[in-house]
Amino acid sequence: MKIGDVEVRDDVFNVKVKKHVLWEVVKWQLAKRRQGTHSTKTRGEVAYSGRKILPQKGTGNARHGERGVNIFVGGGVAHGPKPRDYEYPLPKRVRKLGLKMALSDKARNNAIIFVDNIDLGKKPKTKKAIEFLKNLGVEKEKVLVVIPEKADVLYKSFRNLPNVRVLLPEGLNVYDVLWANKLVIQKDCLDRIYKKVEA
């Protein structure tokens, strides 16, 4: 299969897309990102006395015990959130398959652009980054740029643009691929992308 003038592997860029697999991987990724630091106090943790607030009988009011129960304002929360880890295991095979499907989906929609080199000069300039995107005709799209090595000039030039994300091939993931309308990939990243979906 060819994308532009680049020959790519069918088993990575031309796989049958199953939406459910993509959904599974994205759900797993977002669950992993959750902080899970939410916390509420139960009736045992709120700062109230355990004294009975009114007699059991004779007042005409409903029966009550202490002030810290969940039915009172300022009382504890019943079944509220406690700190927890939302991460759960997802088979590697499914994760790799998800990435292949996401790349295949973009390839099918002509949303992948291969470039020989991304040269924005020696100093970070957002202006040059915008020019680069304009030359590719993707300045108004959400763009994922895949580069072969960490380059401060590239990261800093693109980071001021809210619709652009920059990743190394090893950091390529289903969520970011699906987020982008266009993928701009430097040609010498291809082998490392293949390695990622095989490893």
Swiss-Prot record:
SUPFAM superfamilies: Ribosomal protein L4 (SSF52166)
InterPro entries: Ribosomal_uL4, Ribosomal_uL4-like, Ribosomal_uL4_dom_sf
GO molecular function: rRNA binding; structural constituent of ribosome
A cellular component term, taken from the record's GO annotations: ribosome
GO biological processes: translation
Keyword rRNA-binding: yes
Pfam family, one: Ribosomal_L4
Assigned keywords, A-Z: Ribonucleoprotein, Ribosomal protein, RNA-binding, rRNA-binding
TM stretches of this protein: none
Entry similarity comment: Belongs to the universal ribosomal protein uL4 family.
PANTHER family associated with the record: 50S RIBOSOMAL PROTEIN L4, LARGE RIBOSOMAL SUBUNIT PROTEIN UL4M
Main function: One of the primary rRNA binding proteins, this protein initially binds near the 5'-end of the 23S rRNA. It is important during the early stages of 50S assembly. It makes multiple contacts with different domains of the 23S rRNA in the assembled 50S subunit and ribosome. Forms part of the polypeptide exit tunnel.
Complex and partners: Part of the 50S ribosomal subunit.
Record protein name field: Large ribosomal subunit protein uL4
Protein's organism: Aquifex aeolicus (strain VF5)
Upper lineage: Bacteria, Pseudomonadati, Aquificota, Aquificia, Aquificales
Gene: rplD
